[in-house]
């Protein structure tokens, strides 16, 4: 069975975090572990993370999302087949990771997968399906014009090896940076218009649905 490491950055996420963790750890047909970096929470986020055997958590200074995710990439164990990014307040469908893997498993070079999302309210009531305008058919144009939905990203070990070679001192968002690295190394892009994430919108979102509208 393939192994996937989920990279999760948290900050004061106690309210919705248990639901997210349960959905991630319930992924079917693939083994998952979670590497979580807490970005200076003052609530019970770290306490919740430590309750799960398959979650490894560490903390540090408040770096904000982009640099926090970069730190996760640099600290991630390279001995997994696949890697995925994760937001702290979403809910994943059980087939999320395996669906992505099936799209890139036969690619023998760095590969990056992204998908649409289901935008939901704080109670998981459906609002709309948000398709990604970034189809990666023209990667440079699409990344610059539409951005990239990092919470849907799944990528292979070959791309992780490339990402670990770079430590940018200035970065706007981690998901765009990952996309640019994949482009720079002539990687493979796959855009899936199916949605496997319930992308929760609420008053305390660190990153909101305007990035996926």
Regions found by a protein language model. Give the residues of each.
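Nucleotide-sugar donor-binding/catalytic module of glycosyltransferases
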Residues: 1-211
């Amino acid at each position: 069975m393939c192994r996937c490491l989920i990279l999760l950055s948290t900050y004061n996420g106690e309210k919705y975090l248990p639901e997210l963790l349960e959905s991630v750890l319930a992924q079917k047909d693939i083994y998952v572990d979670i590497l979580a970096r807490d970005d200076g929470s003052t609530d019970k986020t770290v306490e919740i993370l430590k309750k799960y055997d398959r979650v490894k958590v560490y903390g540090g200074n408040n770096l904000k999302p982009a640099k926090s995710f970069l730190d996760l990439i640099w600290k991630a164990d390279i001995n997994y087949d696949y890697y995925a990014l994760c937001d702290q307040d979403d809910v994943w469908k059980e087939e999320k990771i395996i669906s992505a893997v099936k799209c890139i498993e036969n690619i023998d070079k760095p590969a990056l997968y992204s998908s649409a999302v289901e935008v939901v309210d704080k109670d998981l009531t459906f609002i709309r399906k948000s398709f990604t305008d970034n189809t990666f058919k023209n990667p440079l144009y699409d990344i610059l014009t539409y951005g990239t939905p990092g919470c849907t990203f799944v990528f292979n070990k070959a791309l992780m090896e490339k990402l670990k070679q770079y430590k940018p001192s200035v970065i706007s968002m981690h998901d765009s940076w990952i996309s640019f690295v994949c482009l720079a190394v002539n990687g493979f892009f796959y855009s899936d218009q199916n949605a496997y994430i319930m992308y929760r919108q609420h008053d305390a979102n660190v990153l909101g649905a305007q990035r996926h509208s």
